[in-house]
């Protein structure tokens, strides 16, 4: 069986933490920022984790399953 290829879009967007959770960036932070408050923009800056429901799908894209 050939080697599995990692999805190149997924490898740019997701990263694994030390505990095995998957880190992701928030959406809505690239343009149309004038109408968003400072607080909204600040909170969108931080990383978040992928929800448990989506974890298996992302792991499959990253060839971790």
Swiss-Prot record:
The keyword Nucleotide-binding does not apply. Keywords: Ribonucleoprotein, Ribosomal protein. GO terms for cellular component: cytosolic large ribosomal subunit. One of its GO terms (biological process) is translation. GO terms for molecular function: structural constituent of ribosome. It holds the Pfam family Ribosomal_L35p. Signal peptide: none annotated. Belongs to the bacterial ribosomal protein bL35 family. This is Large ribosomal subunit protein bL35. It comes from Porphyromonas gingivalis (strain ATCC BAA-308 / W83). The gene is rpmI.
């Amino acid at each position: 069986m050939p080697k599995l290829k990692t999805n190149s879009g997924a490898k740019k967007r997701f990263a694994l933490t030390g505990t095995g959770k998957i880190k992701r960036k928030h959406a809505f932070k690239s343009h149309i920022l004038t109408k968003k408050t400072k607080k909204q923009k600040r909170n969108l800056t931080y990383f978040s984790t992928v929800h448990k429901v989506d974890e298996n799908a992302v792991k499959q894209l990253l060839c971790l399953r």
